[in-house]
Structure formats: structure tokens, C-alpha cells
Amino acid sequence: MLGAAEFRAIFVANIVSMLGSVVAAVALTVLVYQQTRSPALAASVMALSFLPYLIGGALLGAAADRLPARRVLVACDLASAALIGCMVIPGVPLPGLLALLFAIGLIAPVYQGVRSAVLPEVLPPGPRYVLGRALMRMVAQSAQVVGYGVGGLLLASLSPRGALVADAMSFAVSGLVLRFGMAARPGGATRRGSMARDSLAGLRKVFAHRPTRRILLFSWLVPACVVAPEALAAPYATHIGQPARAAGFLLMGLPIGTVAADIIAARMLTSRLQRRIIVPAALLSFAPLAAFAGSPGLVLAVGLLAVAGLGHAWAAGMDGLLIDTAPSGLRNRALALAGAGIMFTQGAGFALWGIAGQCLPVTVVVPLAATAGVLAATLLRPRRPARLT
């Protein structure tokens, strides 16, 4: 898999930029808190990082079809590096920092959408493509675990602005890797009209195709429900008599299980079996969450979350199914929309379950999220998986 030079470049660039993104979130959160001493404003940094995915995915999704992939990916990395560099300038007011964060967030769905669209050209659709997607997800999950640790180490030795400088450099390195590691490809056919109008038209066409719509909704709503215990990690740690910092251990549970699930599903299961376990695996994601009604201790809770993460094996089958189901002329749009939608709905899930946790005990909210997830997985299950040849 990593023997393919182009995929190797995309993979390495993804590692570098993902680590940089996580470190930036930690550093900017600390910087905002240092300026304001407001926990609410510091928390808004994380929330604001998800919102642009909806706007960028909807209004800029046509970039995956209209523009040369390498040029877009490199431009996105360099623009992100420049914007983060602006955050380092002393005296930038809080509204300016948040505006810069929002602008970076608008770039992210374009980058991910174009990367998703070019991946089937680098890795032909089939087992190699599914494995490549699984490796990308593993990077994203591992970055959450490793990146927070790296962010903490950087903040221990550098100021928040110093950590942001390191992050800007990571995006610049990612851009260089892509510039010299990817082949130049022409963009799609020239279209009249604005990028936003073209993107919205593509969005309507994708959602008008019922099988594709069901796949997208499944891929968005299931993760939005799974994140409930992560959204309530700190309150749950306090609920079971642990210090709030124990939330860090809870946050490691799902990513550990998810990485294991991607390895197992992509390496050990056939394409046909990957698709057959989509719904059972999704249901496995929610079964352990019901046990939170009994207030399991810290070690057991982390174990339950790791088991829930194993249920993410459903994603391997869904990757191939989306490629086969989306109409050929809409495949790039569907792939771009899938990635942007997952990020946005996970952010919305964080907000929703966090608000619910203000009104209800955490031991009620997590099982409630599990119930909602079971309903989503059951009602939106793929009805006619594409035949494999």
C-alpha cells in the first residue's frame, strides 16, 4: 500500500497536517483562555472549528471537480500555514483569532474533499482503496491521541504562540510533500457560474439520489451519536469520583477501538463481508454505551468505549459502498460531502449531547444517545448493497 509513491505522499502529508491541526486546537484554546480567563470562550474554539465544515462543504465542494487536485491541496496547506502565522502576531484581538480560526475551518473541508476525490485515482476502487481509506482514518484517530500529548509537551516547553509557529511549519511541510510527491492532474471540465452555485447544485443532485442520500445520512448520524461519551467525558469523570483530568483517559477509549477496527476490517475481512457487517458493527458501537446507565468505574468505562470503537468497522464497508453507489458524475461531490458532513455532525453531536448533559444526568444522556444511534443505524441501513464482481 505505502509502496505507491503518490499515496505515500498523501499519507505522510496527512499525518503532518493532522498532528498540526490537533496541536493548533490545544494551543489556541490555551491562548484564548490566557487572554480572557473564560472557560466558555476557550471551549468555543473547539466548537468553532467544526462549524465551517458545513459552510465550506456546501459552498466550496465543487473544487473537487473543477480544479487540479495537487494545486488545490498545496494551496490549502500554504493558506493554512499563512493564517496560523497571522495568529502568532502579538496583539491580535480575540475576534481576530476566532476569525482566523473560522477561515482555516473553511479551508479544511475543501482540502479533505479534494483528497477524498483523488484517492480513487491513486488507489483503484476495491480492496486497496478501502485499505487506503482505513489508513487515513487511523491517522485521524491516532492524531487525537498523539496530538494532544504533543500539544501538551510543546506547551510545557514553548508558549502557545510557539506551538502555533510549529503548527504553521507543519502545514508548510505538508504542502511541500504534496507538491513534490503527487503527480499533476488536470482539473475537471470548465463550468460556467460561481463555485458556490456549482457546489449547491451538486449538493442537490447528490441528495436527490436516494441510495447515496441514505449512505451519507447513515455515515453522519451514527458518528454524531457515538461521540456522546466524549462530549461528556469531564462530567462523567466527576460523576464517578475521579478528577476532571481523568477525562483524558476516557477520550482515549474510542480512538483506540476505532484504530483496531480499521485494521481488522481493512486487512482481515473481504469486501463482501465488510458490507454485510455494516449494520451489526454500527449496533456494536452503541451496545456498550447502554452500560453507562450503571455508572461503571474509570477502567471499565475506558474498556467499554474501546469496545464501542470496534464497532467503527462499519466504515470500511461503507467506503466501498459509497464509491459503487454514487452516480459516476457525482462521485467526487459525494466523497467531498461525506467527509465534510461527518466533521460537522460530530461537532453538532458534541454540542447537542453537551446541552443535554446540562439538563439530564450523564448516566441518562449517554444511553439516550445510544438509543438514538440504534434507531439511525436501523432506519438508514443500506437496502441494496452494490454487487461485487
Regions found by a protein language model. Give the residues of each.
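Alpha-helical transmembrane-bundle signature of multi-pass membrane transport and export proteins
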Residues: 1-389
